[in-house]
Amino acid sequence: ICSLIKLKDKPFIINKNHKFMAIIPAHNEEAVVADLIESLKKQDYPKELYDIYVIADNCTDKTAEVAKQAGAIVYQRFDETKKTKGFALNWFLKQKIEEDANYDAFCIFDADNIVDVNFLKNMNKKLCQGEDVVQGYRDIKNPTDNWITAGYAIFYWTMNRMYHLARYNLGLSPLINGTGFMVRFDVIKPEGWVTKTLTEDIEFSLKRIIKGKRLGWAVDAKVYDEQPLGFKQSWKQRTRWTVGHIQCIKEYTKPLAIATKENKTLMNLDGLLYIITLILLALNFLIYAGNGMSGLDLFMNCVRYLVPTFLLPIGTAMLIMLLDKRPIKPMLRGLVCYPLFLGS
């Protein structure tokens, strides 16, 4: 129900145009990074109030040269022992903190993104409303290419409405999810961007939730992300996400449980339930398996559990597409294959 309610505007607590860093961590992205830079240069926002930075991270191609020619300020980083996006962001942001750089906030983008012309304007609005960490609306550049890209599109459309919007309307916290998000510069000045898992976005979100800090949601700040076409590449990407999630379980289940007990807030509890979802699913299966059932009975019970688990998202996705006024016909193949996408 909360996902059906339109996001309400907060009153402004300040009215000004803030200065932004647009940061693009990039590893061997010479083929796509210029398109993102061009979309950022076309922002409907005062040009003197944002700078575009590319972190050419352990690149072996011409990412740095292409980005520089496109108009970005390029920082090159070479460190074979620390290769993740989180390390690259911390390396760059520490330099900006030490410089006492004159910025109010920064936005992070993946190199294959295209940014809506009103992105910075809408993030500035969120800053004026008092938000300090805000996730934008993550959409897909290539939703109809094949069933894999369609699966990604349906997943993110569902997350946007059923997770981010619903939680924000309930007074809970959305999560940042990799790209198209904004952070007030002051937030990271005390310690930098310190993350240690493969899913630095989720980790950063959980650390904020543990501190009782709610993240924001900006439905009008849109970024378009390109998704992989091949199953092997998609599998590798989602395996990395799963490993990162497991790392977050190990690192943050106990702190979230302590925060939930001490603060007694729904936001802390919601963060805890999110992080232990994989554990709950595994326990659910073990309860079935350990309930005296074996053979055919166990199989049929699992089928009764799994069928609605995988079919319900199709109906949910169709509802979301209708609410968002998206055409269903081009996505039929993706809808039919969505359970396979989720299960793989």
What is each model feature region?
Residues 1-16, 67, 320:
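N-terminal membrane-anchoring/stem segments of glycan-assembly enzymes
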Residues 12-14, 273-344:
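Membrane-embedded multi-pass helical conduit in multi-pass membrane proteins
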Residues 18-21, 51, 203:
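Cell-envelope/extracellular polymer assembly enzymes that use nucleotide-activated donors
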Residues 34, 61-68, 76, 118:
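Acidic helix N-cap motif at the loop->helix transition within catalytic regions
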Residues 56-64, 79-81, 114:
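A conserved acidic beta->alpha catalytic loop
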Residues 62, 109-126:
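Acidic donor-binding/catalytic loop of UDP-sugar-dependent glycosyltransferases
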Residues 76-99, 118-197, 235, 239-250, ...:
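Long helical/loop segments within the catalytic core of UDP-sugar-dependent glycosyltransferases
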